[in-house]
Design a protein with these regions (language model features):
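An internal, D/E-rich "acidic patch" concept
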Residues: 58-114
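Alpha-helical transmembrane segments of integral membrane proteins
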Residues: 2-3, 13, 92-130, 144, ...
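Short hydrophobic, aromatic-rich alpha-helical segments embedded in or entering the lipid bilayer
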Residues: 43-76, 182, 213, 262-272
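Membrane-water interface segments at the C-terminal ends of transmembrane alpha-helices
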Residues: 22-29, 59, 70, 134-165, ...
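Hydrophobic alpha-helical transmembrane segments of membrane transport/permease proteins
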Residues: 15-66, 82, 159-180
Length: 313
């Protein structure tokens, strides 16, 4: 197992290198000039050129890339063009809200979707199953930002049960912290819940058709025991796989969700940096997102060995 983990970690290096090259040059060919934004709308060409020289943007692109790679190899993601603060510090300051939102969404989605999928498989072609399939279709069809605005309108504007926007750190109290995450977690997790519920249903249906499940039922074992100890355990690998894929989608989805709910996390920082053409922040954030996705995939692959004894690395 240790050798497999080391091989996977080494295999991530080329992936991260490709991401770094792609991000750097894509930003350079994208329209917009951070020097022009800093200089202002009425700035002269000479003023803009002076700002570009100060930022080092007047150097050849390959020279800029080599300098950035050298700093990156030393763990330095650079300095923000606008705030003049280290990118690592900015990311660290915004990390807590994003991690809290991602974990809360993951908890809500898994806690709701897996039981729903199991019930749908057990009650196949009955009312419960049809309701779950309708929810799955709607979950895939409704965009996350639309779900966010609908939830805000119903539960924050009309019913006034929850705050419209805003994130409260856990240091300010547990309930304000949870209260600020309820709507964003549901909005971000709608598609995720639909995906997990549908895969859980499909995987459970396949397992429930096996002979050993019919044998367990014929012996008079309790339905809960059959479903949880025999069926769900053997259906876990596909479910865990889709949970891992969904986490990668959640990491990308926080950009829109944090913007809608005004959460000061990495997603909001990404939007602000892209609009300002703050190259160091965008480059650093995309590398962090890519590394998180690679790490999640590694954890999911390792979990297979614990879920299925037949899998060995």
């Amino acid at each position: 197992m240790t050798a497999y983990i080391l091989r996977r970690l080494l295999a991530t290096l080329p992936v991260m290198a490709v991401v770094a090259v792609f991000v750097f040059f894509l930003l350079r060919i994208a329209p917009g000039d951070p020097a022009a934004i800093i200089a202002g709308e009425d700035a002269t060409a000479e003023a803009i050129s002076a700002v570009r020289a100060k930022l080092g943007l007047d150097r050849p692109v390959l020279e800029q890339f080599a300098l950035w790679l050298w700093r990156l190899a030393q763990g330095d993601l650079g300095v923000s063009i606008f705030s003049n603060l280290p990118v690592t510090r900015l990311i660290a300051q915004r990390l807590e809200p994003t991690v809290a939102l991602t974990l809360s969404t993951l908890f809500v989605a898994v806690a709701l979707a897996i039981p729903v999928g199991v019930i749908a498989a057990w009650q196949v072609r009955k009312l419960a199953d049809r309701l779950v399939m309708i929810f799955a279709v709607l979950g895939f069809a409704v965009p996350g930002f639309l779900a966010a605005y609908v939830l805000i309108y119903i539960f924050a504007v009309q019913l006034q049960w929850l705050p419209v926007q805003g994130y409260r750190p856990i240091a300010e109290g547990l309930w304000p912290f949870i209260e600020g995450l309820i709507l964003p977690s549901i909005a971000l997790g709608v598609t995720y819940m639909a995906l997990i519920a549908r895969i859980t249903r499909a995987s459970m249906l396949e397992v429930l058709s096996q002979d050993y499940i019919r044998t367990a039922n014929s012996k008079g074992l309790a339905t809960r025991r059959v479903l949880l100890l025999h069926a769900l355990k053997n259906a876990a690998v596909p479910i865990v796989t889709v949970i891992g894929i969904g986490i990668a989608l959640l990491i990308s989805g926080v950009v829109i969700t944090e913007t809608v709910f005004n959460i000061p996390g990495l997603g909001r920082l990404t939007v602000d940096a892209v609009l300002k053409r703050d190259y160091p922040i965008v480059q650093g954030l995309i590398l962090v997102f890519a590394a998180a996705k690679v790490l999640v995939n590694l954890v999911i692959d390792i979990s297979y060995a614990f879920l299925d004894p037949r899998i060995r690395y």
